[in-house]
Design a protein with these regions (language model features):
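Short beta-strand element of the alpha/beta-hydrolase
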Residues: 73-84
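Bacterial N-terminal signal peptides that target proteins for export
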Residues: 1-10
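N-terminal signal peptide c-region/cleavage motif recognized by signal peptidases
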Residues: 18-19
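Alpha/beta-hydrolase-fold serine-hydrolase catalytic core, especially in secreted/extracellular enzymes
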Residues: 229-230, 237-286
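Short amphipathic alpha-helix adjacent to the substrate-entry channel of hydrolases
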Residues: 90-109
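Gly/Ser-rich "nucleophile elbow"/oxyanion-hole loop immediately N-terminal to the catalytic nucleophile
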Residues: 68-75, 118-157
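The feature captures the conserved acid-bearing segment of alpha/beta-hydrolase catalytic domains
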Residues: 169-239
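Short conserved active-site loop signatures built around small residues
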Residues: 24-74, 166
């Protein structure tokens, strides 16, 4: 199925349509230091403690990262990012910088057609190689056993495709488009780790019922499906609006062992479960 080009090629214009100003971003309930040694934070939606930088490391990947890597022996988890159709890493630059400020190394595929997930895995291969070198920016400073895939729209579908790689720990697709554009439905039942499936209650481009519901039903892994009420398709553009805090919490919990983030998703009275801005379905998550 082909999506009308007028809807998907103008993602950058969606910043004007974002409902982010109306959405809440839950903070952490406490300040216990994550098990991996990264600093605790008091608000997942606020910038983290690391100063950041970004650059195009090759023709296929842009990397957003803490300016100084490996301080105090830290090994930084990896997030692979896929853009929506017509978008680029800079389209989502404030979100990617936000994650980098929390200590993640974010490798964004430099393609506007990320639906196959191939370019995202290419970025992972690059970082794994660089981490194994004896010298260089990334030498021995990355935790290649803690890897997430994330992306928006076509890139969200791509993040599910890339989520089949056995090196992937967890996924976080934003409003994934899963009806074509490189996406294969067989990937949905072949995931390597838990998924935070994010949709928008007012999304008319990647309709949750057509694009996300089948993913939720087919997934072979635990899924937290959170639908942000009132969010249109372009909410993730820029700083990701109401998705920023929860997505950061999900990644910190699974990649940094940040127990402060656990309560947003897990437990009988999880934070997002009782948040009036979110509609939640959980599968294999208690």
């Amino acid at each position: 199925m082909k999506v009308p080009a007028l809807k998907l090629t103008g993602i950058a214009l969606g910043m004007m349509l974002s409902a982010g100003a109306m959405a809440t971003n839950p903070g952490t309930p406490g300040g216990e230091q994550p098990g991996t040694g990264f600093p605790a934070v008091s608000d997942f939606a606020a910038s983290g403690p690391f100063s950041t930088t970004n650059s195009n490391v090759n023709t296929t990947c842009a990397v957003y990262r803490p300016r100084t890597l490996g301080e105090n022996g830290l090994r930084h988890p990896i997030i692979l990012w896929g853009n929506g159709t017509g978008g680029s890493p800079s389209t989502y630059g404030r979100l990617l910088e936000h994650w980098a400020s929390h200590g993640f190394v974010v490798a964004a595929a430099r393609t506007s057609n990320a639906g196959s997930g191939e370019e995202m895995i290419s970025c992972l291969n690059y970082l794994v190689t660089e981490n194994g070198r004896s010298t260089g920016t990334f030498d021995g400073k990355l935790d290649v056993n803690r890897v997430a895939t994330a992306g928006h729209s076509q890139g969200g579908g791509g993040s599910i495709m890339a989520g089949q790689d056995s090196r992937v720990t967890v996924t976080a697709p934003f409003q994934p488009y899963t009806l074509g554009l490189g996406h294969r439905s067989s990937s949905q039942s072949n995931q390597s780790g838990p998924m935070f499936l994010m949709t928008g209650g007012s999304d008319t481009i990647a309709s949750p019922s057509l694009n996300a519901r089948p993913v939720y039903n087919r997934a072979n892994v635990p899924v937290f499906w959170g639908e942000l009420r009132g969010a249109g398709h372009f909410e993730p553009v820029g700083n990701a609006g109401g998705y920023r805090g929860p997505s950061t919490a999900w990644l910190r919990y699974h990649l940094m062992e940040d127990s402060n983030a656990e309560g947003l998703f897990y437990g009988s009275n999880c934070g997002l479960c009782s948040d009036r801005n979110w509609d939640v379905n959980r599968k294999g998550i208690n």
